Amino acid sequence: MSTTKYFEDFYLGEKFYIPAKTMTDAHFLFFAGMTGDNHPIHYDDEYAKTTRFGKRVAHGLLVASMTASGASTLSPMIEGSIVAFVEQSSRFLKPVLI
């Protein structure tokens, strides 16, 4: 069992790992249905071939949601100390190709 960590116990740049996930078309279709983001870059292979990426690209917010703290090694450390998740910022360095 991990020791409970509070806000002041963390340091900038600290890393927590999330197990690898295999995404399928079902994930992308479900996300598009839930959010209404039906841009063809996410589901149309022929359209995607005409873009600078050349392949379909995962929804940015779907990718960000896969980093949820509950799925990481952070979860057991904050279980008894977290009150609410207030904010998250993301910077996408490269596209996640489908």
Per-region residue spans from a language model:
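Hydrophobic beta-strand-centered segment that forms part of the acyl-chain substrate-binding groove
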Residues: 49-58, 62-98
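Catalytic strand-loop segment that frames the active site of acyl-thioester-processing enzymes
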Residues: 1-58
